[in-house]
Amino acid sequence: MKTLVSQAVSRLARWGTKWSLWPPHLVTACCGVEVGHLFGSAYDAERFGMLPMGSLRQSNILIIEGTITLKMAKFVKYIYEQMPEPKYVVAMGACAIKGGVFYGSYHMVPAAKVLPVHAYVSGCPPTPEGRPKSRDEGPGADSPCRKLSGPST
């Protein structure tokens, strides 16, 4: 009986963790302003269970906004390794996805070469219209990364 209750509680905790995203964001470019809009009154990401966190050890989704340089890549990987499971990565903006204006530069690394990226939000900087588009291009329908773009229309 004790193991049955323990398994049920464990399953409930995993489900709650999966659908309660606590994202810090790694701001290295202008896309950081757009993430601020997510937590503002217009989009109110908190109604979907997303709370902005300052500590990476309590977060389970990392939003990369901007370029990752060669020097910064090992630190970004270290940050990702500190996050608890389940953990997700979102590449936001042209700089994080392909390099933006720095494309082809010797010191720039796309986010997908450093970490496993689960969702992409395109644009420079991504507009509010770009986030719903990411719902259709991202991972499966049950992915918590889809919460970034709010309810589908």
Task: Give short role names for the model-derived ranges.
Residues 1-58:
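N-terminal, charge-rich interaction modules
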Residues 3, 17, 28, 67-69, ...:
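Residue-identity detector for threonine
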Residues 6, 10, 20, 41, ...:
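Generic serine detector
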Residues 13, 80-84, 139-146:
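Structural signal for hydrophobic packing residues in well-ordered secondary-structure cores
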Residues 33-37, 41, 46-114, 121-130:
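Cofactor-cradling patches in redox/metallo enzymes
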Residues 111-153:
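C-terminal functional extensions of proteins
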